[in-house]
């Protein structure tokens, strides 16, 4: 019986070893360039003597992203929040091609430290609105609610005054 168990263990180990090869070219994901997709958002953090973790603990908080269908075309669009970069909204044109509609949609933001976002139809009109959270040490830290007007234009309709 011991010999049979040893034989089965040996065969099992050999099967595992033989099946573990790393020569497969079957990739599940392919990296697409920003020239192919149109998505070129970069939230680059530039540290210096006055802007670093010790003087500004929020420096590594942020760079959020929300994904949702803002124009009801059954294609998911992308909204990025930036810390040292402008917020960006990309409209999905299909086949992983996006248009940057940040300026025309009015969602670029200002000099706040944007840390995250979510999409929700807050006013129940059938279009996704964008809620953007803000952090920081100085200045106004009100979160922003961007209301989708249904024509790829957003208006800032409310602010969350958390008192922080």
Mark where each language-model region is.
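Calcium-coordinating acidic loop motifs
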Residues: 69-71, 75, 93-94, 120-127, ...
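C-terminal motif of bacterial Sec signal peptides marking the signal peptidase cleavage site
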Residues: 18-19
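Beta-rich catalytic cores
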Residues: 61, 85, 113, 141
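Beta-propeller blade repeat segments, especially FG-GAP/WD-type strand-to-loop junctions
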Residues: 29, 86-101, 140-153
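Hydrophobic beta-strand segments that make up the repeating blades of beta-propeller
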Residues: 77-82, 130-135
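Bacterial N-terminal signal peptides that target proteins for export
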Residues: 1-8
């Amino acid at each position: 019986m011991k010999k049979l168990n040893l034989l089965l263990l040996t065969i099992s180990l050999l099967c595992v070893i033989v099946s573990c090869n790393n020569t497969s070219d079957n990739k599940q994901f392919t990296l697409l360039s920003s020239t192919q997709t149109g998505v070129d958002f970069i939230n680059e953090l530039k540290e210096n003597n006055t802007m670093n973790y010790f003087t500004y603990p929020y420096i590594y908080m942020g760079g959020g992203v929300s994904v949702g269908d803002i124009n009801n075309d059954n294609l998911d669009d992308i909204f990025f929040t930036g810390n040292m970069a402008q917020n960006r909204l990309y409209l999905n044109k299909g086949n992983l091609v996006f248009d940057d509609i940040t300026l025309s949609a009015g969602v670029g933001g200002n000099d706040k430290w944007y840390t995250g976002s979510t999409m929700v139809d807050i006013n129940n009109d059938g279009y996704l609105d964008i809620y953007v959270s803000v952090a920081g040490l100085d200045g106004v830290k009100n979160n922003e609610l961007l209301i989708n007007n249904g024509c790829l234009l957003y208006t800032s309709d409310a602010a969350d005054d958390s008192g922080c």
